[in-house]
C-alpha cells in the first residue's frame, strides 16, 4: 500500500492539513498537527504506512510523526 502523507502548513496566517488533494483548515498549528497525527494513526491501524510532515516558516519540511515509530498519542 502507498504511504499516507499528511502535510501541515501555514497559509494566510491560518494552518491547514493537506491530504489526498484536500485541505482542512485550522486556527492553530497545534490543532492541525494533532488532527493530522490522529488521522495518520487511523490510517496506520488500517495497514497503511503513514507520515505527518510540518512545514517551517523557512519552507523546510520536517517529519513530525510516522506510524509505527512514534508514541501515540504524541506528547504535548
Regions flagged by a language model, labelled:
Residues 23-25, 32, 69-70:
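Short, surface-exposed beta-strand-loop junctions and turns on beta-sheet-rich folds
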Residues 27-45, 49:
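A short, charged, amphipathic alpha-helix used as a generic interaction element across diverse proteins
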Residues 4, 56-76:
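A cross-kingdom feature marking charged/low-complexity
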Amino acid at each position: 500500500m502507498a504511504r499516507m502523507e499528511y502535510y501541515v502548513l501555514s497559509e494566510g496566517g491560518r494552518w491547514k492539513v493537506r491530504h489526498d488533494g484536500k485541505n482542512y483548515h485550522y486556527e492553530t498549528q497545534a490543532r492541525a498537527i494533532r488532527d493530522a497525527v490522529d488521522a495518520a494513526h487511523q490510517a496506520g491501524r488500517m495497514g497503511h504506512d503513514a507520515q505527518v510532515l510540518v512545514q517551517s516558516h523557512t519552507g523546510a519540511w520536517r517529519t513530525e510523526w510516522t506510524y509505527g515509530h512514534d508514541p501515540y498519542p504524541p506528547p504535548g
